[in-house]
Design a protein with these regions (language model features):
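Gly/Gly-Pro- and Ser/Thr-rich, intrinsically disordered tail segments characteristic of DNA damage-repair
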Residues: 1-236, 242, 288, 372-420
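DNA-contacting surface of Y-family translesion DNA polymerases
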Residues: 5-7, 194, 202-345, 417-419
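Short, charged/polar surface micro-motifs in flexible loops or helix N-caps
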Residues: 18-20, 48-51, 307-310, 355-358
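Short small-residue beta-strand/loop micro-motif enriched in glycine and branched aliphatics
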Residues: 85, 310-314, 359-361
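Short, hydrophobic beta-strand segments
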Residues: 119-125, 313-316, 362-368
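A glycine-rich phosphate-binding loop feature that marks nucleotide/adenosyl-phosphate handling sites
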Residues: 158-161, 241-242, 296-307, 345-356, ...
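C-terminal hydrophobic structural anchor segments
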Residues: 322-323, 327-387
């Protein structure tokens, strides 16, 4: 068997906000003299007055009462009747995410935004500025806590995999290392389910085969693992179990192959009158992104998640490439009506792919050129206003007149898109 690589010339940090949504709301409330949500039974998500929706995030005291992320608020309240419920605030999340990433970016020019609440930092070559990596990690952690009022974990290693595994060790407000020489003591005793990117289906197959720890996986024969869970997945997880990962920290994203927008809801979406404004807001977002990048799409797809967490999607090819919001919206509406059976929804998304340059357009005999030009001028006007005054400063009337809360979420999503 191959020995674990030790790429001593790399130094990678993974910075992860502890219970991000709950922490961000707590930081704001504490500035207002209110109790810290992290110290009391509390959750983010749902309508406090109606006691509806789902639990998006929970405090440790709420967790001790048996409250679980993703369960209905009504069920959580039966377990924890005195729990404080706070509705989601997407504007706040965007603001806090931007603030913590700004601090992280001040330590290295090579930062990869992995999600709204976590980043990778490539600290390779910073030894003159930060000769002690652990001290540098503590400095980042303490600055975020002191300046922003919430805590993070920082994982340190020689690659992204091990750095992220390290940041998931004891929480909150901790710095952990997981260097290759520490793998046998720190990582191999962990349950196999703790390995990054190992899903429930693979876990079930591995445990049934007697592979219960990450160490068991690392010391098995790779061909046996591939037989159990497939060649590609088996190879990757076998490498991960041995601490091998050569993926770079990407300061710039790969060439875009498509654009997408998704919205998760705390309450059930149950009517087409609620769905249409959501689809329009998302089509507005992806079309504006295409126009900024001077691209057009040739394919549109919609996706949605039901109350039992089942995902469904539907896709179609367009007769002509487009970047016009209204054309994408009409297509998305049709796709949704063809695939939705009326079951309650918790997530809706729109994506566009098959991108082409916007300097070529094939005309159709069946298109109304005047209507097309009118739509194009409307999009151009909205783009110009948003560029001058901010992405969140103008919203289509159909969105504002639609489902409650959709406009606010769409504006927050567009603001975040413009500033990243």
């Amino acid at each position: 068997m191959n020995k674990t690589k030790k790429p001593a010339d790399r130094l990678i940090f993974h910075v992860d906000v502890n219970s991000a949504f709950l922490s961000w709301e707590s930081a704001r409330r504490m500035k207002e003299g209110l109790p810290d949500l992290r110290d009391i039974p509390a959750c983010i998500g749902g309508d406090p007055a109606k006691r509806t929706g789902i639990v998006v995030a929970k405090s440790i005291p709420a967790k001790k009462c048996g409250v679980q992320t993703g369960e209905p608020v009504a069920m959580a309240l039966r377990k924890c009747p005195n729990m404080v419920i706070v509705p989601s605030d997407f504007d706040l999340y965007v603001k806090c995410s931007r603030a913590f990433k700004k601090i992280c970016a001040s330590y290295t020019p090579v930062m990869e935004s992995f999600s709204i609440d976590e980043v990778f930092l490539d600290m390779t070559g910073t030894s003159l500025l930060y000769p002690d990596p652990i001290a540098a990690a503590h400095e980042i952690k303490d600055r975020i806590s002191d300046e922003l009022g919430f805590t993070v974990n920082v994982g340190i290693s020689t690659n992204k995999l091990l750095a992220k595994m390290a940041s998931d060790f004891e929480k909150p407000n901790k710095v952990h290392t997981l260097f290759p020489e520490e793998i046998p003591a720190k990582m191999w005793p962990l349950p196999v389910r703790e390995l990054l990117f190992l899903g429930k289906a693979s876990e079930k197959k591995l445990t049934e085969a007697g592979i219960r720890t990450i160490g068991d996986l690392a010391h098995a024969w790779e061909t046996d693992i591939q037989t159990l869970i497939g060649n590609k997945n088996g190879h990757q997880l076998y490498q991960y179990a041995r601490g091998i990962d050569d993926s770079p920290v990407k300061a710039q994203p790969d060439e875009v192959k498509g654009f997408s927008a998704e919205t998760t809801f705390n309450e059930d979406i149950v009517s087409i009158e609620q769905v249409d404004p959501i689809l329009l807001a998302q089509c507005d977002i992806v079309a504006a992104r295409m126009r900024r990048k001077k691209k057009k799409c040739t394919s549109v797809s919609i996706t949605f998640r039901t109350l039992d967490f089942r995902n469904r999607s539907h896709q179609t090819k367009l007769p002509n490439a487009t970047d016009i919001t209204d054309e994408i919206y009409r297509c998305a509406k049709q796709l949704f009506r063809e695939s939705w059976k009326g079951e309650p929804l918790r997530l809706i998304g729109v994506s566009v792919t098959g991108l082409t340059e916007d300097d070529f357009e094939q005309l159709s005999l069946f298109e109304d050129p005047e209507k097309k030009e009118k739509s194009r001028k409307l999009d151009a006007a909205l783009d110009a206003i948003r560029q001058k005054y901010g992405n969140d400063k103008v919203t289509r009337a159909s969105i504002l007149n639609g489902a409650q809360g959709i406009a606010r979420k769409a504006k927050a999503q567009m603001k975040n898109d413009a500033e990243n």
